[in-house]
Regions:
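Domain-level representation of secreted and single-pass membrane ectodomains enriched
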Residues: 2-390
Length: 390
């Protein structure tokens, strides 16, 4: 949708010109001496950065439209012809119908402690019929209680009306994002449901909701819950920031193949205070110990039902591994206390040339423990795309 601003300029002398440098259409009257010049200024309603900070966003629209949307003007845009309109909802049961809107806890920016157990539901209506997905950016997501074995006491569930819904998450997820597929009909909606089981812990959430059109270059492939772009980046499992792998996870983390790149390398994130790879479940974890273990012929990772899956990996992405006990030539499943394709005590990078690039996490519905009966953290993996021909 484009905003039309009608400026009326009274010209008293022939030859006077409009000072506008935006896209304009001029309409001249018949009177050459007293001439009304109408300039219709068009600018798209794009995401803008508010004056409150570089990570707070709004939509560039007119002042009057911002007021009609119950937003607040925070800085100007479109060469001063528009305002950056900040929009947010925080009351349980609220609905939103505009792009670039925040969903926040009641009383935000203060924390929120519910007085009773129950749910808090927000509804997202499509801003246009061309919208296929929502992208949720968790600028703040903390205080959602989760037990030391991964069971979700508090949770957030996002649901659309088509495709597979994202997993229900809990714990600390500040800085993460999530894609939600919505239906094809213009009246289709999506919901975010907060469920409170712990009424003693203060919670805080500030979720930026972007509506992604079907033709957008940033539309995620089907069933990609996290979608990363760029030749380098870091993929983290939900809850890792709070040192907790969540039970009942089943979702894809996808990386867009950039132009001129044919392979990808993954390795543990270094220098973190949180264990970068700890994927265990409540089976006989003594057989896994604290070493990395790829999918074995006796199916240890599959048997425990908690694992990271990466298609067709090897040390160089091309050559199969030497025949070894319990390690297939192109491992696909990873679990244990170190990431890699070695059963030693050192994590190893792995490569894959199979596209699309995809890291899948599956965790058992049974709460997860490591071999020392303490919480297992999940994973944080750095990726680097590899140019074709290398």
């Amino acid at each position: 949708m484009h905003l039309l601003i009608l400026l009326v300029v009274l010209l008293l002398e022939r030859g006077q010109t409009s000072p506008l440098n935006l896209n304009t259409t001029h309409l001249e009257g018949r009177d050459q001496r007293q001439l009304s010049l109408f300039a219709v200024v068009n600018f798209p309603n794009l995401k803008c950065t508010t004056k409150t900070g570089s990570t707070t966003y709004g939509t560039c629209i007119s002042t009057s439209e911002c007021t009609s949307r119950s937003g607040s003007a925070s800085g100007t845009c479109a060469a001063g012809f528009g305002v950056c309109c900040y929009m947010a909802v925080s009351t349980c049961g609220s609905s939103l119908s505009y792009n670039n809107t925040y969903i926040q806890n009641p009383g935000y920016p203060s924390t929120y402690t519910p007085t009773t157990t129950g749910t808090c539901v927000y509804t997202v209506n499509k801003a246009s019929s061309d919208v296929c997905q929502l992208r949720l950016d968790f600028q703040t997501f903390s205080g959602f209680a989760v037990t030391s074995v991964g069971a979700k006491t508090d949770s957030m569930a996002a649901a659309g009306q088509t495709g597979k819904n994202p997993p229900t998450i809990s714990g600390t997820n500040t800085g993460y994002h999530m894609y939600v597929n919505v239906g094809a009909d213009s009246t289709d909606t999506a919901t975010l449901t907060m469920t409170w089981g712990d009424i003693a812990t203060a919670k805080q959430y500030n979720i930026f909701v972007q509506q992604i059109e079907c033709s957008s270059a940033y539309k995620a492939p089907q069933d990609c819950v996290q979608y990363f772009t760029g030749t380098t980046g870091t993929i983290q499992s939900y809850g890792w920031a709070g040192s907790q792998l969540l039970a009942g996870m089943d979702y894809n983390n996808c990386v867009r193949t950039e132009l001129g790149y044919c392979g990808i390398q993954y390795k543990e994130t270094s220098g973190t205070s949180i264990d970068a790879f700890a994927i265990f479940a409540t089976i006989t974890n003594t057989q896994i110990a604290l070493a990395a273990l790829a999918e074995s012929t006796d199916g240890v990772c599959s048997a425990q039902g908690t694992m990271v899956t990466i298609p067709m990996t090897s040390l160089d992405g091309v050559s199969p591994l030497p025949i070894a006990t319990n390690v297939p030539p192109f491992p696909t499943e990873f679990c244990g206390g170190l990431f890699g394709i070695s059963t030693g005590s050192v994590a190893t990078p792995v490569q894959s040339n199979q596209r699309p690039f995809n890291v899948h996490l599956f965790t058992s519905a049974t709460p997860t423990l490591d071999s020392a009966s303490t919480a297992t953290t999940g994973f944080s993996l750095d990726y680097t795309q590899i140019p074709c021909g290398i």
